[in-house]
Amino acid sequence: MSTVDIDSLVEQICSLDLCKAAELVDKMEQKLGFPKGGLLTAVPAAGGGQAESSAAEEKTDFSVIFDSYAADKKISVIKAVRECTNLGLKEAKEFVEKEGAKELIEGKKYKKEEAEEIKKKLEDAGAKVIIK
C-alpha cells in the first residue's frame, strides 16, 4: 500500500460512527486472533500502587445492558441493535424479543463515552438501556 492509500484509509476509519468503529475493532480482533477484550486484559499493569488505587476508584469499562423496549418501536429497536452489533437481522430480532435484561454484546466492555452513545442510540429507537 502506498502512503496515499493509508491516508485515505485513516480518513475513512476516522469518519466511522462509534458503533461502526466498535464493529471494526471486533472484526480486526477476530481476524488477527487477539483474545476477547483486547490485549490489555492479558497484560498485567506496570507501575506503582498509586496507579492501581486510582484505577480502582474510577470505573473505565462499562457493560451495556438491554432491558426492554416499547412494543410499537420494535422494528426501530431491531435496526438500532443491528447497527450497534455484528448481529444479522434474525439474530437481532431474537435478541430483542428475548425476555429479561441482557448484555448487548456478552462480555464486551465499553469506554464511558462509547457506552453513552450506544445507550442514546438504542433509547432514541425505543429501548430501555442500563449502563453498568
From Swiss-Prot:
GO MF annotation, one: structural constituent of ribosome
GO biological process, one term: translation
UniProt cross-references to CDD domains, sorted A to Z: Ribosomal_L7_L12
UniProt protein name: Large ribosomal subunit protein bL12
GO CC annotation terms, alphabetical: ribonucleoprotein complex; ribosome
Signal peptide positions (record): none
Keywords recorded for this protein, A-Z: Ribonucleoprotein, Ribosomal protein
SUPFAM superfamilies linked to this entry: ClpS-like, Ribosomal protein L7/12, oligomerisation (N-terminal) domain
Encoding gene per record: rplL
Superkingdom of source: Bacteria
Annotated family: Belongs to the bacterial ribosomal protein bL12 family.
The keyword Ribonucleoprotein is annotated on this UniProt entry: yes
InterPro entries, per database record: Ribosomal_bL12, Ribosomal_bL12_C, Ribosomal_bL12_C/ClpS-like, Ribosomal_bL12_oligo_N_sf
UniProt subunit comment: Homodimer. Part of the ribosomal stalk of the 50S ribosomal subunit. Forms a multimeric L10(L12)X complex, where L10 forms an elongated spine to which 2 to 4 L12 dimers bind in a sequential fashion. Binds GTP-bound translation factors.
Lineage of the species this protein comes from: Bacteria, Pseudomonadati, Pseudomonadota, Alphaproteobacteria, Rickettsiales
